[in-house]
Amino acid sequence: MKTSHRLKLVGLLSWCIAMIALSTPAQAQTEYDIWICGTQVTSENCGDLSVIEGVNGTVTYDPTTKTLTLQRATINIGEEGQAIYSEINDLILKVIDTNNVTTVKASALFITKPLTITGGGTLNAKSQDFCAIYAWGTDLTIDDCTVNASSAGYGITGDSGESEKLTIRNAAVTTEGEQEGAICNFHSLTLEGCTLTQPAGAAFDASLNGVALNGELVKRGLTIAKGTSGILQPTISTTAPKGIYTLNGQKLRGSLPAQAKACISSAERKS
């Protein structure tokens, strides 16, 4: 009897534990609106996205700062789908060192909400058939980094060109879209701390919604160089009249005071 009671007690306790376990909801993982090689980023995998097939190197996502970090990373999805697809508002794509993002029949980087590419490194985005970087009805900023975008279709592109804004700030960019355009389908292009250097004479054409030359969109060899502001440097005349002049241009008689000479000498040393 004692054994029977003991077994019943153990059975009852086991049943109670099982019921408690069943009634306690499992901790659900959080899903984020960003996909890498077709796999959605979650609270479980965001700390190491190299677990996704097609991803190598260091790839992480910080949901607190909405930052996707690539460091010496290769993301290659192969035939179908986008290498990186994002619906996150104000996503930051931080590139450290050199990173390669490639696909075949879709966009290497596809965004539906504003994105800033930054981090001081290099992003090589390549699509064999479609878009290297596709800003679908949204704004794209490239800031303090290097971006090389190439595709047989579109290089860096918006969608309709009605509202999409492309801002390139203190960055170096090369892009080509062999069939459609290197930079196209944008409402505006803003360059800060950099200059469109190739092809010579190319500029943003609002009527074509892209960078154009001679009335046609540039498709190959478009280069934006960092650190050239386009401000002309003043030319100093070597035949300026000798003497001492006021700010109004009147010539003074006598020699320059010693204090003034000392100030000029100091200024020359600083320059």
Tell me the role of every PLM-derived stretch.
Residues 5, 26, 169, 225, ...:
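Serine/threonine-rich, low-complexity intrinsically disordered segments
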Residues 6, 17, 98, 259, ...:
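Generic N-terminal leader/processing signal
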Residues 2-14:
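Bacterial N-terminal signal peptides that target proteins for export
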Residues 1, 23-25, 246:
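A composition/secondary-structure signal for short, hydrophobic, low-basic-content segments
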Residues 232-271:
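C-terminal outer-membrane/trafficking sorting elements
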Residues 17-27:
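C-terminal segment of classical bacterial N-terminal signal peptides
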Residues 27-227:
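A composition-driven surface/loop motif
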